[in-house]
């Protein structure tokens, strides 16, 4: 299934966390928190301003982002979990 996000929305796939600590202890899935980092899969056209003009998003497909803990709506695409976020829910772009 393909989804094209609208306006200032993004489709994000969470980045998987490590299964063990730096000390070598394995972390069970029940003890893990959902990661707050993800890779942008698709972006909308931009945010519509009050004057009717569309402002393009600062984020592009392929960016790795950091987002707030309770942000977005969880969806499943082709059996994989994704999030639909608004640009304002993004805290920053991770540059590597």
Curated annotation (Swiss-Prot):
Per the entry, what this protein does is: Together with the chaperonin GroEL, plays an essential role in assisting protein folding. The GroEL-GroES system forms a nano-cage that allows encapsulation of the non-native substrate proteins and provides a physical environment optimized to promote and accelerate protein folding. GroES binds to the apical surface of the GroEL ring, thereby capping the opening of the GroEL channel.
Write out the entry's keywords from A to Z. Chaperone, Cytoplasm
Report any Pfam family annotated for this entry: Cpn10
BP terms from Gene Ontology: chaperone cofactor-dependent protein refolding
Domain of life from the UniProt record: Bacteria
Q: Which GO terms describe its cellular component?
A: cytoplasm
Where is the chain membrane-spanning? none
The record's listing under InterPro entries reads: Chaperonin_GroES, Chaperonin_GroES_sf, Chaprnonin_Cpn10_CS, GroES-like_sf
User: What protein is this chain from?
Assistant: Co-chaperonin GroES
Q: Does the keyword Cytoplasm apply?
A: yes
Q: Which SMART domains match?
A: Cpn10
Location within or outside the cell: Cytoplasm
UniProt similarity note: Belongs to the GroES chaperonin family.
Subunit note: Heptamer of 7 subunits arranged in a ring. Interacts with the chaperonin GroEL.
GO MF annotation terms: ATP binding; metal ion binding; protein folding chaperone; protein-folding chaperone binding; unfolded protein binding
């Amino acid at each position: 299934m393909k989804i094209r996000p609208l306006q200032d929305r993004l489709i994000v796939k969470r980045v998987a966390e490590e299964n063990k600590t730096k000390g070598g202890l394995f972390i069970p899935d029940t003890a893990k928190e959902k990661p707050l980092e993800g890779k942008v899969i698709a972006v909308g056209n931009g945010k519509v301003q009050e004057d009717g003009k569309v402002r393009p998003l600062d984020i592009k497909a392929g960016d790795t982002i950091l987002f707030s803990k309770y942000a977005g709506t969880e969806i499943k695409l082709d059996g994989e979990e994704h999030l639909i976020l608004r640009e304002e829910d993004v805290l920053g772009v991770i540059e590597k």
